[in-house]
């Protein structure tokens, strides 16, 4: 163990030394670069691009290019990159995560690799935690890039397609990860290639990379549309499942938010609906409603995961505590919660396109990031994204003191201690920032502060811009502020006059988060750039963290607890126990993310095949459209003959009527009556069919295909692909829902899902061929002049 830790430490130290040497080389360029005029400095961009065109690489020019950006930032912003920022920029250029502490200037550091990679003209994406930060950084850092002759774009929601296209065409584009991901999905739903807004994904730098790639990775991006499936089942299901008991009718894992029906639970639903087997495919809609109702009642929590306001269920962002206007839970979960809460039930949505954040960002040719808290997830970053974490030293030695946790037996005892601490700090004018894990907890604590007569600010339900503005004042003398842990992230808290002498900003964490990294981020709000500061977590066994832990083990540990007169746990060691609980839950979340990634990777691979198929059709030239149509018809006919004339069945038993009907749909004028197909071998039937195919081929070759008809046929093909793909996606979703059942039969559930998904995908491709064939033939009927009587006679059954 110690050997491994020492090895990691040595590797990190070697990396830091290597980067420090490169930073020293950049410093050597400073006198030369600083002597240039503004115009000469701008001209460097042209020179660098010419050198790259002549075959030099980014590594060949990086030292000089970084020196140019540093000088431009000094002239435009009045900010000169510290050596540690140069090191962070170099780490990101190499495709790593630069772990830089809060207040160390990550945003400025990102200008260095962004500029360097933008010189290739492929587009650089800078991903921020929210739209406010995207706008802010685009405006502030964009001044440096524009000064150097590069273009800068902003990609946020509510923009038109043409505005987005312009933003993506820029050398450097700022935006949120979800918006980039949704644009990718929307691009694969367009009906003209020129309507796509994204270029091929080249290089992305992700700010707060752990929040975006890990904490938010459990929620897939989904574009959905109204399904037309009635919502009347949800209230009925709510009346059934509300009486269920854990361990009896259902089992759940609060750490991973998974829930399973027991045999007894399934039987209760079967009795209620008068069916034999809930898991039969004919009852898949019922099973879907049952599982979502279970999640609504026993996983999702009011005022934590969602709120009910004006008769509407509204999602709460788990990281900021902010209500997400206009968003709804997908796949029927929203409707199940509405039934639970007794409000009007909205229409359920069908999934039209989906991707996880993980798989979206893995499509970039090169990825990098920055955060103050990557080390605890070092292994996951490497396993999932092949990203190394490099810890960059601080510019000034840290003067923040992190006190040991105080752990109390009850919530009430914890709040009393928090109030005492705040009063003590407030008496000397020292500012205090109190971090909570949810809006509901913030409000509870605020009420307790008001009762205790403590003046304070409650940072809830604010816009991102207001949050940033208010949290920036948290370091002022006498300030007391309550906020969710992630509120106003990305905003520096500057100390007011005289606050350094009082000890700086003091942070109080009121609960340990499910992730140690978010606790680190809260602590990191104090003691920026060598300022004094301190932090302490004051928590209790009533906190949500312990609700997620094994309750039997928790009870066992509680039975040994000894407290002092204030209710603080003194024995057994509470800090060790808290670390154990947090690690267990973090591991469970890691497993859940791996679970999602394994399943989604199967769907992602299939998505890419379908998206490629769509693009192929949309890219067809006028002369190629009919050939593409014939390709689908040819495949459909081959599959039809094989399906109705199987080798392992006697020809007397073949479904000739079914075959004839299918061929009539494939050829709008199939020349042979049904009796011509009876009592024939497969080869003879195939010969008749392929003769007919050749006639169709010749007829299509004579067909005039103008631009309008070309466009219509392309649209028909793509509409058919989309319709079948949407059904397939929803089918895969149902398969995912029942995956836990496979493990009961000693099957590997992931392998089983992979095999089932593959079989469904083969069926999907066959359905697409059949659909394109039928739809196109129906459309083209009017284009042919045929002998109606002859056609009618041939097509009689």
UniProtKB/Swiss-Prot annotation:
UniProt-annotated location(s): Cell membrane; Cytoplasm
E.C. code: 7.4.2.8
Any one GO CC term of this protein is:
cell envelope Sec protein transport complex
Q: Enumerate the UniProt keywords alphabetically.
A: ATP-binding, Cell membrane, Cytoplasm, Membrane, Nucleotide-binding, Protein transport, Translocase, Translocation, Transport
Q: Which Gene3D superfamilies does this entry report, sorted A to Z?
A: Helical scaffold and wing domains of SecA, P-loop containing nucleotide triphosphate hydrolases, SecA, preprotein cross-linking domain
Q: Please report the record's description of how this protein sits within the membrane.
A: Peripheral membrane protein
Write out the residues that bind ATP: 85, 103-107, 492
User: What does the record list as GO biological process?
Assistant: intracellular protein transmembrane transport; protein import; protein targeting; protein transport by the Sec complex
How would you classify this enzyme at the top EC level? translocase
Family annotation (InterPro entries): Helicase_ATP-bd, Helicase_C-like, P-loop_NTPase, SecA, SecA2_Bac_anthr, SecA_CS, SecA_DEAD, SecA_motor_DEAD
GO MF annotation terms: ATP binding; protein-exporting ATPase activity
Q: Does the keyword Cytoplasm apply?
A: yes
Q: Which reaction does it catalyse?
A: ATP + H2O + cellular proteinSide 1 = ADP + phosphate + cellular proteinSide 2
Q: Which family does the similarity line name? A: Belongs to the SecA family.
Q: Report the function annotation for this chain.
A: Part of the Sec protein translocase complex. Interacts with the SecYEG preprotein conducting channel. Has a central role in coupling the hydrolysis of ATP to the transfer of proteins into and across the cell membrane, serving as an ATP-driven molecular motor driving the stepwise translocation of polypeptide chains across the membrane.
How does this protein assemble?
A: Monomer and homodimer. Part of the essential Sec protein translocation apparatus which comprises SecA, SecYEG and auxiliary proteins SecDF. Other proteins may also be involved.
> Any idea what this protein is called?
Protein translocase subunit SecA 2
């Amino acid at each position: 163990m110690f050997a491994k830790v020492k090895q990691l430490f040595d590797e990190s130290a070697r990396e830091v030394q290597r980067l420090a040497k490169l930073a020293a080389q950049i410093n050597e360029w400073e006198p030369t670069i600083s002597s240039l005029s503004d115009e000469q400095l701008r001209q460097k961009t042209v020179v660098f691009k010419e050198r790259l065109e002549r075959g030099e690489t980014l590594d060949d020019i990086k030292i000089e290019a970084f020196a140019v950006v540093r000088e431009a930032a000094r002239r435009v912003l009045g900010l000169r990159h510290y050596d540690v920022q140069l090191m962070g920029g170099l780490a990101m250029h190499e495709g790593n995560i630069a772990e830089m502490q809060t207040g160390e200037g990550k945003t400025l550091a990102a200008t260095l690799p962004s500029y360097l990679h933008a010189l290739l003209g492929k587009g650089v994406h800078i991903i921020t935690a929210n739209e406010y930060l995207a706008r802010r950084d685009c405006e502030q850092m964009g001044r440096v890039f524009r000064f150097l002759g590069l273009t800068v774009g902003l990609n946020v929601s509510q923009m038109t397609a043409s505005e987005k296209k312009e933003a993506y065409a820029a050398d450097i584009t700022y935006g949120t990860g979800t918006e980039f991901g949704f644009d990718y999905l929307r691009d694969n739903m367009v009906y003209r290639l020129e309507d796509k807004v994204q270029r091929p994904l080249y290089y992305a730098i992700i700010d707060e990379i752990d929040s975006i790639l890990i904490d938010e990775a459990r929620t897939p991006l989904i574009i959905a549309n109204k399904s037309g499936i009635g919502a009347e089942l949800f209230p009925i299901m709510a009346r059934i499942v509300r009486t269920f008991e854990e361990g009896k009718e259902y089992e759940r894992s609060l750490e991973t938010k998974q829930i399973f029906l027991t045999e007894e639970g399934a039987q209760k639903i079967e009795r209620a609906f008068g069916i034999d087997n809930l898991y039969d495919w004919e009852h898949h809609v019922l099973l879907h409603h049952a599982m979502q109702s279970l999640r609504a009642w026993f996983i999702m929590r009011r005022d934590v995961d969602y709120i009910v306001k004006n008769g509407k269920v509204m999602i709460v962002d788990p990281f900021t505590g902010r209500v997400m206007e206009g968003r709804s839970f997908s796949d029927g979960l929203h409707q199940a919660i509405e039934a639970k809460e007794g409000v009007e039930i909205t229409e359920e949505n069908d999934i039209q396109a989906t991707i996880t954040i993980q798989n979206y960002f893995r499509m970039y040719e090169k990825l990098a990031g920055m955060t103050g808290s990557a080390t605890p997830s070092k292994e996951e970053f490497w396993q999932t994204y092949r990203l190394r974490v490099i810890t960059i030293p601080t510019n000034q030695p840290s003067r923040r003191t992190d006190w040991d946790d105080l752990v109390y037996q009850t919530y009430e005892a914890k709040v009393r201690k928090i109030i005492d601490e705040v009063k003590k700090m407030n008496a000397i004018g020292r500012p205090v920032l109190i971090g909570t894990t949810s809006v509901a907890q913030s409000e509870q604590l605020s009420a307790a502060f008001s009762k205790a007569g403590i003046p304070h600010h409650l940072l809830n339900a604010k816009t991102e811009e207001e949050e940033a503005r208010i949290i920036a004042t948290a370091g002022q003398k006498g300030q007391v502020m309550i906020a969710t842990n992630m509120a106003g992230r990305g905003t520096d808290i500057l100390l007011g006059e005289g606050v350094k002498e009082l000890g700086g900003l003091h942070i109080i964490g009121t609960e340990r988060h499910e992730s140690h990294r978010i606790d680190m981020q809260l602590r990191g709000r104090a003691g920026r750039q060598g300022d004094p500061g301190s932090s302490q977590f004051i928590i209790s066994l009533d906190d949500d963290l312990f609700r997620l832990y094994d309750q039997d083990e928790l009870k066992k540990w509680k039975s040994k607890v000894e407290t002092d007169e204030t209710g603080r746990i003194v024995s057994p060691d509470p800090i060790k126990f808290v670390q154990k609980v947090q690690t267990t839950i973090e591991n469970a979340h890691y497993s859940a993310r791996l679970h999602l990634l394994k399943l989604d990777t199967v769907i992602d691979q299939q998505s890419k095949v379908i998206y490629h198929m769509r693009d192929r059709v949309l890219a067809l030239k006028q002369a190629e459209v009919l050939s593409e149509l014939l390709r689908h018809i040819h495949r459909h006919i081959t599959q039809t003959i094989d399906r109705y004339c199987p080798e392992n069945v006697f020809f007397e038993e073949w479904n000739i009527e079914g075959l004839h009907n299918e061929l009539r749909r494939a050829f709008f004028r199939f020349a042979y009556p049904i009796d011509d197909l009876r009592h024939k071998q497969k080869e003879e039937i195939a010969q008749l069919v392929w003769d007919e195919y050749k006639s169709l081929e010749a007829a299509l070759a004579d067909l005039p295909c103008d631009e309008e008809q070309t466009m219509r046929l392309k649209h028909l093909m793509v509409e058919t692909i989309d319709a079948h793909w949407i059904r397939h996606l929803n089918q895969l979703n149902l398969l995912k829902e029942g995956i836990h059942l496979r493990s009961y039969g000693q099957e590997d559930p992931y392998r089983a899902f992979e095999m089932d998904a593959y079989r469904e995908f083969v069926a999907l491709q066959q359905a697409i061929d059949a659909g394109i064939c039928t739809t196109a033939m129906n459309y083209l009927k009017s284009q042919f002049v045929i002998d109606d009587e002859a056609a009618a006679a041939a097509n009689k059954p």
